[in-house]
Amino acid sequence: MNLVRLLETRVTQFEMRSQPRLRMAAPDSGFSLVLAEAKQIPPSFYAYLYDRVGRDHHWTSRLLPEKRLAAEIHRAGIAVHVLYADGAPAGWFELDWARKQGETRLVHFGILPEFRGRGLARYLLSEALAAGFAIGNKVMTLETNTLDHPRALQLYEEAGFIAVSMRVVSTRAIDG
């Protein structure tokens, strides 16, 4: 019998009600950086990015069969952007502006482990905010939890997000 191990985590809901005045320039990371919207991203590539960023943080919401994942990420109102460093995927974000009128949600955001610590997260978040507000909505939202990268909460607060609610949930652990 396979037992599912559950982890308790505190989820914080954030929102930002005005676009930041300044857009961050690409960091001097030593890489040639390219940010591209991945229109109709192949589910297998999305799953790779999701796993590389989320596995250590027990992300489970998009561990779906391929057809169901494709339906989620290819529906209207979803955009996925991938950051490439010297041609290799280094990070990504997903926006959803169809879920709630007037609001753009930063659904997923992260830097692949081998590219962390080089200033890419601040830059990528700045680009995510610019893309999210460019849609025309007045509010950006996101959620993070205590299983996410230890600097995530600080990054979002420094960017200008305000915590609006918290809740405690249990999530399935990813072992191995």
Give a label for each model feature.
Residues 112-126, 135, 147-151:
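Conserved glycine-rich acetyl-CoA-binding loop
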Residues 79, 138, 162:
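Short acidic/polar active-site loop segments enriched in Thr and Asp
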Residues 133, 155-166:
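Conserved acetyl-CoA-binding loop of GNAT-fold acetyltransferases
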Residues 116, 142-152, 164, 169-175:
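Conserved beta-strand-loop-alpha-helix junction that forms the acyl-donor binding cleft
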